[in-house]
Regions:
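A general structural-boundary detector
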Residues: 1, 17, 42-45, 92
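A beta-strand edge to alpha-helix "cap/lid" segment located at domain peripheries
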Residues: 3, 60-132
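A solvent-exposed, acidic/Ser-Thr-rich amphipathic alpha-helical stretch
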Residues: 4, 8, 24-82
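Solvent-exposed, amphipathic alpha-helical segments
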Residues: 6-21
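Hydrophobic pocket/interface hotspot
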Residues: 14, 26, 30-31, 38, ...
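Alpha-helix boundary/capping and short turn/kink residues
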Residues: 20-24, 95
Length: 132
């Protein structure tokens, strides 16, 4: 497979695991998809601990806040020397709004080590009781 094909497959796995409800399965996928020293920059302001475990907990909190959702690539995935950028759309719409965004990822040795996320039109509800 080409670098582009590998990147497309990795982006698909990355987006899909944000919908995985089973904690053990999600953490296993996170450990396969993201590098050990993974870094995420995102705009929600929700708690985000370091590394893969921090991402796992962050996704769990988002699922509590937003319910069932999936992400789909919207358009082409542009790749260049271990970097990729693409737009995405969240399904179903949240609170009547179609939530969209764009991400830039850096991949080293087949794993995502850096993710920069921009989210459009998302207003988060109050955190659930017991949420971090």
């Amino acid at each position: 497979m080409s670098e582009r094909d590998d990147m497309i497959a990795l982006v698909s796995r990355h987006l899909a695991l944000w919908s995985v409800k089973d904690d053990d399965l999600r953490l296993s996928e996170i450990n396969d998809v993201y590098g050990e020293e993974f870094e995420l920059i995102e705009p929600t302001g929700l708690p985000l601990g370091p590394g893969r475990l921090g991402l796992h907990e962050h996704i769990g909190l988002l699922q509590k806040l937003l319910g069932d959702f999936t992400f789909e690539v919207d358009g082409d995935i542009e790749t260049h020397h271990g970097w990729a950028t693409y737009a995405w759309v969240q399904r179903p719409p949240y609170n009547g709004r179609t939530v969209t965004g764009r991400e830039v990822i850096h991949v080293v040795d087949g794993r995502i080590v850096f993710l920069f996320m921009v989210i459009h039109d998302l207003e988060l509800p109050e955190r659930p009781a017991g949420g971090a």
